[in-house]
Amino acid sequence: SFYGSWIDVKSLNKIDKKDLFKKTTEKGEFYFLKKLSKKINTFDLLQEQTPIILDKIQWQKSMKWGNFSLNWARPLKSILGIFDGKNLDFKFYHLKCSNITFVDKEFEEKKKIFKNFKSYKIFFQKLGIIIDQNLRKDFIEKRLKKISGRRNIIIESNNKLLEEVTDLVEQPNILLCKFDEKFLSIPKEILIITMQNHQRYFPTFDNKGNITNEFLVVANNKDLKGFIKSGNERVVEARLNDAQFFWKKNKSQNLVKQVSKLKTMNYFKGLGNYFDKIQRMRKLGGMISDELLISKEKVELSASICKVDLISDLVGEFPELQGILGGYFSEAQGFDKEICQAISEHYFPLGLETKTPKKPFSIALALSDKLDTLVGFFGINQKPTSSKDPYALRRLALGVIRLIVENNKEFKVKDLISYAISLYRDQELKLFNESLQKELTNFLLERLKYYMKEKQIRTDIIEASINSYGIDHINKIYKKAVILNNLINKEAGKDIISSYKRASNILDSELKDKQLELSNAADPAIFKNNFEKNLLKKINELRKYFANINKDENYSQSLINLANSKKAIFEFFDNVKVNDEDKDIKKNRLELLQMLCKTFDNYINFSSIEMN
């Protein structure tokens, strides 16, 4: 089949197969055809398309000015457009494109005419303005590295912030600033967010990873008198003064005594308040602790106080630090280290990039929080659609997958979901989605598929793995798929698939009319040759191997054992006629093939795996 733009039947008949090439997409493998489009004059194209493109630009906030109908982020005075020395001639609302623009030169707007791009570039170079965004970004990055190297401080890589400041300046100048060392007693995350998110500064760290009181500012001009430097230092110290006040106040407030205040804080309509949520998390976390063989009391205590930071002033100022600040508050009040860490990490992982909690108490608390949320929102039908996910449930479900897979654990997810549902009902909170268990299970498996695709695992292997095992075997599904994916294009992988396909193709053909019933047991008494005996011997060896596997299957060894059966399988097919005239012999040989396929299926169902 073809993929891409529509090709009519007449055109299709004129295409030579040698002109096509294959390409794998998310929807499968397709043939593609390269077509040359007709030649278009670039100048004409720019003149025609530029106003259309400008009109399609969307702004989060826009404004009108004067009597003009144009909506834009800021008032526009002119449009400069030159290509190959020629002026573009088009209208955009009340503005006409020309070779004239207005330059802010020493706080006075002056009209400026340009003949070509070269004159435009030279003019701004003389003003110290870097018009090329990539060059400007490169200049800023090099200056940041130079100053930090000279001061023996480290700047963490942050391309998003770098891109942002690159767009905010045209005449970049990097300034080294400081704040009072007394603020280093504040949690470093507060310092980082204050500088990075609120002020767009670059925080710095020493060689041990500790934050320092120095930061770098990307200014838009030279700071000859030091006013820009001192101004930025005043701004950050004012913010940190407020943060320090709230930090001292909040860390001393007794967490346990404040738990009851969560009763006044609604969680979500139909799902109770935050006090209700932590009661559910306590019980669900207790069930998870049984599977992890850790202290139920510690998990329950962690759950009881993990949301108290939501009522603090600091979380009001820094909402992105909820959980993390709870960890700091519990540490300041002398709680067990494992409890503090669990609280600090219970929102993680977020998406694909952030860290995954590794400690058992952190895993238990993070899983209980995520599963409770997923059950609640699916229960009241607040599910994601194809285009919208306002409550980030996909991210939460991905977090569940990562907690299981990246910690090499296995949980009875089906039972956890059932128990979470019962906890809502115990609180007389109505979950009216009758298909909740099934829908949430499928949703989690879809997120597992997404995770596996991001790990570059073949689609057919993903489908085969998921179809072979249920929701209680997430880790097994992933690990088996990874090992097979790594082997599939090697000789051993090809041996496995070719061996399986030779048997399954004959079986499928013989069983398609459903007139023949097989019992998955061949009778050695009616074997006619050693090839049948050798194949049965190999099957029994494989069966014994899989029967003796407990929890810890060596997936690589399993595949090697399957690959090593190729010789017996191919010798059987090369020397034995399955479709024998004697019906009993034919059926017995088909039984042998069914035994072979079902033995291979102990790893995964190979029927949907494609041959290369």
Regions found by a protein language model. Give the residues of each.
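Amphipathic alpha-helical "coupling" segments that flank catalytic cores
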Residues: 1-612
